[in-house]
Every structure is written in structure tokens, then in C-alpha cells.
Amino acid sequence: MAGPKRFNKDKRPKRNTQSLLFKRKRFCRFTAAGVEEIDYKDIDTLRDFVAENGKIIPARLTGTRAIFQRQINTAVKRARFLAMLPYSDQHRSL
């Protein structure tokens, strides 16, 4: 009967120290532009925050502040409901 396995520090994957040092600074484009509210009728802006498959891109990838991310979510959902934005771009052709 074997005893419990011990944790070996040498076998753990090494992190890239350079990527930790040169991290890109997060910046919210709405704060920089002085935008107070995001409008669902501004389709060109909303398309930047929707992926090719139709999903809303998360704030950790876009760098958007939480208050603006919530406004983006509601604006995209309203634009989809009014058929200004597609729910998905991957439609099958019959």
C-alpha cells in the first residue's frame, strides 16, 4: 500500500515572468470619451462589443468598467429585440 503522493515543485508549470511584468493597462473607452449613457441605437459602437458568434464580449477582455458593461448588455439586448443587431451570425443556409 503506497503512501500519499507528495507535491513536487519541479513538475509544476512555470509561468512566463515577462508577461506578468508587461501587462496591458485596462482602459475604458467610454470613460475616456466622457460618455454618460450608452444608447441602443448606436449600432456601430455595440458591434465592437459583440463577438462573431453573437455573444457579448466580457468586460475582462474589453476593459470596460462595470457600469458601462451593464449598459452594453441592456443596449445589445434591446437592439437584438428590435432587429437592429442579429442574435447570431452563424445561420445555416437551407
From Swiss-Prot:
One of its GO terms (cellular component) is cytosolic small ribosomal subunit. InterPro entries: Ribosomal_bS18 (IPR001648), Ribosomal_bS18_sf (IPR036870). Keywords: Ribonucleoprotein, Ribosomal protein, RNA-binding, rRNA-binding. GO terms for molecular function: small ribosomal subunit rRNA binding; structural constituent of ribosome. One of its GO terms (biological process) is translation. It comes from the Bacteria. Pfam families: Ribosomal_S18. The keyword Disulfide bond does not apply. NCBIfam families: S18. Binds as a heterodimer with protein bS6 to the central domain of the 16S rRNA, where it helps stabilize the platform of the 30S subunit. Belongs to the bacterial ribosomal protein bS18 family. Part of the 30S ribosomal subunit. Forms a tight heterodimer with protein bS6. This is Small ribosomal subunit protein bS18. It comes from Polaromonas sp. (strain JS666 / ATCC BAA-500). The lineage of its organism: Bacteria, Pseudomonadati, Pseudomonadota, Betaproteobacteria, Burkholderiales.
